[in-house]
């Protein structure tokens, strides 16, 4: 490729709405341009990197035995109504009517369509296992699209769907996809972690997310530095921080805490650690034709409620936070001084595992400006229902028993789910088993955010000059920067020969023949992030030398002109082989 025949749309400044590094650099490097909120044009530089990501994904999916197909972006409402997600999905599902007033959606995922394919095409257990995948544009009408391709409304995704005869077979299909994802992200050159995760709106039983580690990541990841354990903070099990409950050492007493409605303020006033205070959270579950059931959840003062874990507790599916009027009705006081002792009406108490092992703790007195200290289970309160209802924190014991947890930020770029029979049951996707009986197909689904990978890779790989691409997905592997290409026959001939030799060696090379000043050339290619640069100048050629600099190198080095192509080709191959 010659730069004079390519489109290079670099900018000196990032747009005002670009908040994170990847968004700023993708615009400045001429990779993307905004069309509407969360919708982008992918310019030639950006598209080249997208195609390289897609090629790696496609190779590894094929290697894992998946079969490529292509499903429509536009899907009939009937399929979504059949699965039940027409009502469950929120406004991020873009719905519209055609000229005949038939309802359709633009697909955010394709579980319904692929299940429709399977129920019409797969009849026998002999046709399974099978795994279909596609690389296609999706649309989710995000309420606040931001961060460029990291949270866009339209994006490119690889989604795959496996169909098995039973759950044991699904586990094998799931493992193949898990391993394929590890290979994909390793080949791309990302620092990543697979983490145990919650299935969310997709449904099913087990799942893992694949996160690129980056300070700008939206997700908090709990991991153990001394083991392989990693999980989304929302899914990580929080073990009790006390091995057992100590015997009471204090008498229960009411304490004046004027104006101290927060645990931190109470602890400071009483001169005790925050860890001895209790945070009370009031939830409600509605009962048709009757008053709601009110719940009091008790957490240690320095802990936060995990809403996903809470929703999985018996009786708490579909819970909501109680209104202030309900709190006053059940506790006799507004929020800030709530506790389990002396409630106005009966409430159901759930204590976090750590709280259940505490002694001599402080709770609200259900009276404004008062708390109760020296509270103990069994003596002052009946034994509670105990559950894991909090988020883990750095320093907590790792659930695998092999150390303590640390917390980092991650950008989710892939997710694998064991769906089970959620969709096949709803949509009647059955097959005939070995005994001649109809059984629901057991499904898995597996997604990779192709365009999001670009943003995540940049968040891990940049400096003050621009992008530093992982070798495998750089738009070009090598750039040739001739000094005076249009003025010097020697420079032009040497550059053309280098270009031909590198291209013949299978290297993705671009020759900058635009006639730009050296500073402009260097700034453009450092911004775009090409991993290897060769500078050809008359002075160096007189000494038989060409200047080489890797994008990550602090200084340039000189290479013999007659072997420079071979040397750089070897550097590229070595980097790709890592």
UniProtKB/Swiss-Prot annotation:
It is found in: Cytoplasm. The keyword Aminoacyl-tRNA synthetase applies. Keywords: Aminoacyl-tRNA synthetase, ATP-binding, Cytoplasm, Ligase, Nucleotide-binding, Protein biosynthesis. PROSITE patterns: AA_TRNA_LIGASE_II. One of its GO terms (molecular function) is ATP binding. One of its GO terms (cellular component) is cytosol. It catalyses: tRNA(Pro) + L-proline + ATP = L-prolyl-tRNA(Pro) + AMP + diphosphate. Its EC number is 6.1.1.15. InterPro entries: aa-tRNA-synt_IIb, aa-tRNA-synth_II, aa-tRNA-synth_II/BPL/LPL, Anticodon-bd, Anticodon-bd_dom_sf, Pro-tRNA-ligase_IIa, Pro-tRNA-synth_IIa_bac-type, Pro-tRNA-Synthase_IIa_type1. GO terms for biological process: prolyl-tRNA aminoacylation. It comes from the Bacteria. HAMAP family: Pro_tRNA_synth_type1. Catalyzes the attachment of proline to tRNA(Pro) in a two-step reaction: proline is first activated by ATP to form Pro-AMP and then transferred to the acceptor end of tRNA(Pro). As ProRS can inadvertently accommodate and process non-cognate amino acids such as alanine and cysteine, to avoid such errors it has two additional distinct editing activities against alanine. One activity is designated as 'pretransfer' editing and involves the tRNA(Pro)-independent hydrolysis of activated Ala-AMP. Consists of three domains: the N-terminal catalytic domain, the editing domain and the C-terminal anticodon-binding domain. Belongs to the class-II aminoacyl-tRNA synthetase family. ProS type 1 subfamily. NCBIfam families: PRK09194.1, proS_fam_II. Homodimer. This is Proline--tRNA ligase.
């Amino acid at each position: 490729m010659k730069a004079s025949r390519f489109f290079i749309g670099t900018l000196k400044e990032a747009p005002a709405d670009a908040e994170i590094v990847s968004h700023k650099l993708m615009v400045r490097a001429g990779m993307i341009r905004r069309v509407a909120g969360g919708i982008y044009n992918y310019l030639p530089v950006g598209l080249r990197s997208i195609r390289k990501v897609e090629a790696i994904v496609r190779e590894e999916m094929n290697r894992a035995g998946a079969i490529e197909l292509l499903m429509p972006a536009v899907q009939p409402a009937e399929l979504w109504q059949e699965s039940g997600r027409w009502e469950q999905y929120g406004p991020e599902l873009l719905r519209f009517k055609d000229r005949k007033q038939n309802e359709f959606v633009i697909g955010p995922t394709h579980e319904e369509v692929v299940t429709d394919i399977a129920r019409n095409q797969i009849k026998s257990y002999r046709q399974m296992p099978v795994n279909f995948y596609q690389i296609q544009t999706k649309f989710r009408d995000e309420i606040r699209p931001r961060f460029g391709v990291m949270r866009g409304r339209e994006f490119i995704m690889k989604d795959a769907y496996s169909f098995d005869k039973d759950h044991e077979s699904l586990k094998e299909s799931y493992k193949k996809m898990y391993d394929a994802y590890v290979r994909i992200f390793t080949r791309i050159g990302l620092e990543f972690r697979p983490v145990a995760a919650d299935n969310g709106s997709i449904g099913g039983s087990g799942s893992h997310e694949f996160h690129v580690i980056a300070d700008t990541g939206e997700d908090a990841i709990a991991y153990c530095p001394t083991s392989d354990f990693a999980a989304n903070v929302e899914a990580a099990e929080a073990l009790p921080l006390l091995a057992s409950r100590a015997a009471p050492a204090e008498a229960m007493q009411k304490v004046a805490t004027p104006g101290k409605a927060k645990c931190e303020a109470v602890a400071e006033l009483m001169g005790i650690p925050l860890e001895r205070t209790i945070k009370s959270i009031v939830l409600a579950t509605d009962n048709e034709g009757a008053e709601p059931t009110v719940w009091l959840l008790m957490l240690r003062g320095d802990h936060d409620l995990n809403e996903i874990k809470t929703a999985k507790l018996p009786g708490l599916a579909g819970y909501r936070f109680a209104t202030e009027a309900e709190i006053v009705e059940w506790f006799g006081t507004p929020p800030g001084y709530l506790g389990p002792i002396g409630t106005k009406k009966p409430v159901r108490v759930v204590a976090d595992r750590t709280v259940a092992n505490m002694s001599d703790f402080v709770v609200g007195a259900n009276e404004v400006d008062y708390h109760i200290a020296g509270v103990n289970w069994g003596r002052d309160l009946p034994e509670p229902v105990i559950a894991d209802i909090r988020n883990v924190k750095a320093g907590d014991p790792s659930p695998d028993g092999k150390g303590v947890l640390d917390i980092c930020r991650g950008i989710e770029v892939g997710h694998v789910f064991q769906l089970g029979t959620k969709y096949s049951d709803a949509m009647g996707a059955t097959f005939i088993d070995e005994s001649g009986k109809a059984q629901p197909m057991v499904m898995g689904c597996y997604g990779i955010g192709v365009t999001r990978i670009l943003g995540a890779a940049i968040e891990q790989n940049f400096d003050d000059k621009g992008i530093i691409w992982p070798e495998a997905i750089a738009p070009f592997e090598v750039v040739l920067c001739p000094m005076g290409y249009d003025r010097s026959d020697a420079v032009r001939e040497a550059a053309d020969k280098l270009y031909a030799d590198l291209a013949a060696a299978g290297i993705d090379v671009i020759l900058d023949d635009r006639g730009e000043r050296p500073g402009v050339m260097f700034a453009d290619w450092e911004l775009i992030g090409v991993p290897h640069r060769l500078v050809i100048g008359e002075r160096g050629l007189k000494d038989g030398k060409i200047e080489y600099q890797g994008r990550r190198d602090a200084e340039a080095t000189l290479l013999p002109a007659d072997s420079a192509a071979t040397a750089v080709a070897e550097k590229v191959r070595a980097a790709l082989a890592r």
